[in-house]
Amino acid sequence: MIASADLDACREMIRTGSYSFHAASRLLPERVRAPSLALYAFCRVADDAVDEAVNDGQREEDAEVKRRAVLSLRDRLDLVYGGRPRNAPADRAFAAVVEEFEMPRALPEALLEGLAWDAVGRSYDSFSGVLDYSARVAAAVGAMMCVLMRVRDPDVLARACDLGLAMQLTNIARDVGTDARSGRIYLPRDWMEEEGLPVEEFLARPVVDDRIRAVTHRLLRAADRLYLRSEAGVCGLPLACRPGIYAARHIYAGIGDEIARNGYDSVTRRAFTTRRQKLVWLGLSATRAALSPFGPGCATLHAAPEPEVAFLVNAAARARPQRGRSEALISVLAQLEAQDRQISRQRLGNRANPI
């Protein structure tokens, strides 16, 4: 059970740092809302630990600090699954969730792997690569939410992953300019090249034009397809959980609608939704959930998962979760450690041979 003080700290962290999820979570039943706040708080801590790991804005030094932040998160996750969490509210709360719900370790490890990809500065040549990244930093959270609702049906898990993918594609579309000014690009490189926009040109001078608008539009169309398909899985969730998940779907899709209203300009403008809009979507979500038992079934419930999320579906559907580190995470962490050792050797060499 999550300690009340830890839950209060997690709730405050989400209230001030994740407005969209905080709004949607208000429609979840308390038995799901409490562990979901712990889950999102731990994910937020992990994300912030890497995003905020900077060293005076120097690109090379920042990358080193980010690598060390990921390695520290690895150790924190080990402590969580060892039943000895770090003495911090989010860690203690998430450890309680892991124990109560038998959370498959592969799911939070997937998030950590995605953060490790950020730390090594990975970019993505194709849309499939973007989905690989989105699977780790967002669809994994969708799968974990299903576990908190005690739903492990593979079809429902696949649709939850669709929703996570769609949300992350929306985030990428919203943050095109912010990311570019930080030297990062999450858009598919081949889509940019098809529009005649070299990635290096855009990173050197992030300006809005028809080329970047077209890529952003295309990404949001892909998100819309996934949002629509994700709806088929909502009816596989407990009735009391459906309003909150519909709300998450509508609130995040609404960000994409705002980007469209801005002419697909995410370089000079940042899309946001108002409190009034969120209230409207919360009302719509409650209505849709109330009517959901009387609606027809949807054939897309049984659609195969996107190949990039199949490993998440398989992990979450297992009756007995694996507790050891996955091979994928071991590989990317080894890469981070090797880079760290190389930098240390270079520094020792520089001190031994001063100019």
Curated annotation (Swiss-Prot):
Gene Ontology molecular function, alphabetical: 15-cis-phytoene synthase activity; geranylgeranyl diphosphate synthase activity; metal ion binding; squalene synthase [NAD(P)H] activity
Cofactor(s), by name: ATP; Mn(2+); Mg(2+)
CDD domains registered for this protein in UniProt: Trans_IPPS_HH
Enzyme Commission number(s): 2.5.1.-
Family: Belongs to the phytoene/squalene synthase family.
Pathway annotation from the record: Carotenoid biosynthesis; phytoene biosynthesis
Cited InterPro entries: Isoprenoid_synthase_dom_sf, Squ/phyt_synthse, Squalene/phytoene_synthase_CS, Trans_IPPS_bact-type, Trans_IPPS_HH
Protein name in the entry: Phytoene synthase
Keyword Transferase: yes
An example Gene Ontology biological process: carotenoid biosynthetic process
PROSITE patterns, sorted: SQUALEN_PHYTOEN_SYN_1, SQUALEN_PHYTOEN_SYN_2
Keyword Magnesium: yes
Pfam families in UniProt: SQS_PSY (PF00494)
Function: Involved in the biosynthesis of carotenoids. Catalyzes the condensation of two molecules of geranylgeranyl diphosphate (GGPP) to give prephytoene diphosphate (PPPP) and the subsequent rearrangement of the cyclopropylcarbinyl intermediate to yield phytoene.
PANTHER family with a match to the protein in the record: BIFUNCTIONAL LYCOPENE CYCLASE/PHYTOENE SYNTHASE (PTHR31480)
Cofactor note: ATP is required for the transferase activity but it does not seem to be hydrolyzed during the reaction.
Keywords tagged on the record: Carotenoid biosynthesis, Magnesium, Manganese, Metal-binding, Transferase
